C-alpha cells in the first residue's frame, strides 16, 4: 500500500505516481481505496486552481512563460498542502461511497483491480471534474441567485485558497480573511491605487505607520470620529502582490498582542467583533458589515459543498 507521505511527496500527482498506484491497486484494491481517493482529491484541487487561473487576465507586465511555470509549480504545492492530513473531505466522502455496503474480501478471494488508470483520470479531467469546478464558482446567496460580476470572481479566485492556507497557519478564520478583503476593497473593485494608477494590492486597508519601511501611497479615505464620517488623507502600504499583502496582514494580526482575540476566535463572526474591539477600523459598524460578508461567503461555501456531494457519483 502506498503511504500518504510517499503519495504527497510525488510530483503533484504525476503520471508516474498514478501508474504506481494503479499497480498497487491491482495487487490489493481494497487496501488502496484511500490512496486512490486522495489522488483524485489532489487532482480535483489542481483542476480547481487551473480553472481559477483561467479566469484571470492572461496578459500583463509580469506575465511570461517563466511566471506561468512558477505559478503552476506553486499551484501544485498548494494542492499538496490542501490535501495533506484531513484534506478537504472529498477523499473521505469517496471512500465512504466506494466502501458502503461492501465487506473486505477474503484472502483467497479473486483480486479485481480497482478501475483507475491514467486514461480514466484524463476522462475525469475533461468531464466530471471540470463540471464540478464550474459549478463551484461562487454565486451570491440572495433569492435572485444572480452570479457575481467577473471582477468579483477574479478576486475570489486569487484569494480563496491562499486565505485558507493563511488561516491554517495563523488561526485567523479564513472566512474572516476573505470577508475583510472583500469589504475593504469592494470585492477587489475599489482597490487602493498608487500615484501612477497601478494597484497597491493592499486589499486589507493596512495603513503605513512609522514602522513600515516599504513603499506607500497616499489617498483620501473615510475615517470616523465620535461616530461621524470624515474625509481625510492617509498613507497606506503598497505591496508587490496579493500574496505579499496577505502575508503582511497575517503577520500584523499574529505579532500584535492587541489582536490576540482575533487569532483565537472560535468563529469568523467572533473574529469580526474582536477586530473592531481591537481598533482595526474606526467605522462603528465595521463588525456588522464584516459579519454580513461572512454570512454571504458561508452561504457560497455551502452551495459549493452541496455541489461536490451531489456529483460524487459522476467520478466513478
Curated annotation (Swiss-Prot):
<comment type="function">
    <text>Flagellum-specific muramidase which hydrolyzes the peptidoglycan layer to assemble the rod structure in the periplasmic space.</text>
</comment>
<dbReference type="GO" id="GO:0004040">
    <property type="term" value="F:amidase activity"/>
</dbReference>
<dbReference type="Pfam" id="PF10135">
    <property type="entry name" value="Rod-binding"/>
</dbReference>
<dbReference type="GO" id="GO:0044780">
    <property type="term" value="P:bacterial-type flagellum assembly"/>
</dbReference>
<dbReference type="GO" id="GO:0016798">
    <property type="term" value="F:hydrolase activity, acting on glycosyl bonds"/>
</dbReference>
<comment type="similarity">
    <text>In the N-terminal section; belongs to the FlgJ family.</text>
</comment>
<dbReference type="InterPro" id="IPR051056">
    <property type="entry name" value="Glycosyl_Hydrolase_73"/>
</dbReference>
<keyword id="KW-0378">Hydrolase</keyword>
<dbReference type="InterPro" id="IPR013377">
    <property type="entry name" value="FlgJ"/>
</dbReference>
<dbReference type="Pfam" id="PF01832">
    <property type="entry name" value="Glucosaminidase"/>
</dbReference>
<protein>
    <recommendedName>
        <fullName>Peptidoglycan hydrolase FlgJ</fullName>
        <ecNumber>3.2.1.-</ecNumber>
    </recommendedName>
</protein>
<dbReference type="GO" id="GO:0042597">
    <property type="term" value="C:periplasmic space"/>
</dbReference>
<keyword id="KW-0326">Glycosidase</keyword>
<feature type="region of interest" description="Catalytic">
    <location>
        <begin position="151"/>
        <end position="316"/>
    </location>
</feature>
<keyword id="KW-0961">Cell wall biogenesis/degradation</keyword>
<keyword id="KW-1005">Bacterial flagellum biogenesis</keyword>
<feature type="active site">
    <location>
        <position position="223"/>
    </location>
</feature>
<dbReference type="InterPro" id="IPR002901">
    <property type="entry name" value="MGlyc_endo_b_GlcNAc-like_dom"/>
</dbReference>
<dbReference type="GO" id="GO:0071973">
    <property type="term" value="P:bacterial-type flagellum-dependent cell motility"/>
</dbReference>
<feature type="active site">
    <location>
        <position position="248"/>
    </location>
</feature>
<keyword id="KW-0574">Periplasm</keyword>
<dbReference type="GO" id="GO:0071555">
    <property type="term" value="P:cell wall organization"/>
</dbReference>
<comment type="similarity">
    <text>In the C-terminal section; belongs to the glycosyl hydrolase 73 family.</text>
</comment>
<dbReference type="InterPro" id="IPR019301">
    <property type="entry name" value="Flagellar_prot_FlgJ_N"/>
</dbReference>
Amino acid at each position: 500500500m502506498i503511504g500518504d507521505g510517499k503519495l504527497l511527496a510525488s510530483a503533484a500527482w504525476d503520471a508516474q505516481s498514478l501508474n504506481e498506484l494503479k499497480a498497487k491497486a491491482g495487487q490489493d484494491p481494497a487496501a488502496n481505496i484511500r490512496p486512490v481517493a486522495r489522488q483524485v482529491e489532489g487532482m480535483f484541487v489542481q483542476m480547481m486552481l487551473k480553472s481559477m487561473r483561467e479566469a484571470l487576465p492572461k496578459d500583463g507586465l509580469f506575465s511570461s512563460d517563466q511566471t506561468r511555470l512558477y505559478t503552476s509549480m506553486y499551484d501544485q504545492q498548494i494542492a499538496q498542502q490542501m490535501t495533506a492530513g484531513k484534506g478537504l473531505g472529498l477523499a473521505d466522502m469517496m471512500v465512504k461511497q466506494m466502501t458502503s455496503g461492501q465487506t473486505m474480501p477474503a484472502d483467497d478471494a479473486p483480486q479485481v483491480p480497482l478501475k483507475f488508470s491514467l486514461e480514466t483520470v484524463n476522462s475525469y479531467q475533461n468531464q466530471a471534474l471540470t463540471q464540478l469546478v464550474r459549478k463551484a464558482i461562487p454565486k451570491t446567496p440572495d433569492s435572485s441567485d444572480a452570479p457575481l460580476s467577473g471582477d468579483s470572481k477574479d478576486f475570489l479566485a486569487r484569494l480563496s485558497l491562499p486565505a485558507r492556507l493563511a488561516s491554517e497557519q495563523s488561526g485567523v478564520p479564513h472566512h474572516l480573511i476573505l470577508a475583510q478583503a472583500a469589504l475593504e476593497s469592494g470585492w477587489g473593485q475599489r482597490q487602493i491605487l498608487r500615484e501612477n494608477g497601478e494597484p497597491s494590492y493592499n486589499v486589507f486597508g493596512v495603513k503605513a505607520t512609522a514602522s513600515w519601511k516599504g513603499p506607500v501611497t497616499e489617498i483620501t479615505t473615510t475615517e470616523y470620529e465620535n461616530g461621524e464620517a470624515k474625509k481625510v488623507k492617509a498613507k497606506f502600504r503598497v505591496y508587490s502582490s496579493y500574496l505579499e499583502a496577505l502575508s503582511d496582514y497575517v503577520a500584523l494580526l499574529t505579532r500584535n498582542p492587541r489582536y490576540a482575540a482575533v487569532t483565537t476566535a472560535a468563529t469568523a463572526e467572533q473574529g469580526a467583533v474582536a477586530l473592531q474591539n481591537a481598533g482595526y477600523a474606526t467605522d462603528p459598524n465595521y463588525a456588522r458589515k464584516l459579519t454580513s460578508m461572512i454570512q454571504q461567503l458561508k452561504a457560497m461555501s455551502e452551495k459549493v459543498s452541496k455541489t461536490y456531494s451531489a456529483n460524487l457519483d459522476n467520478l466513478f
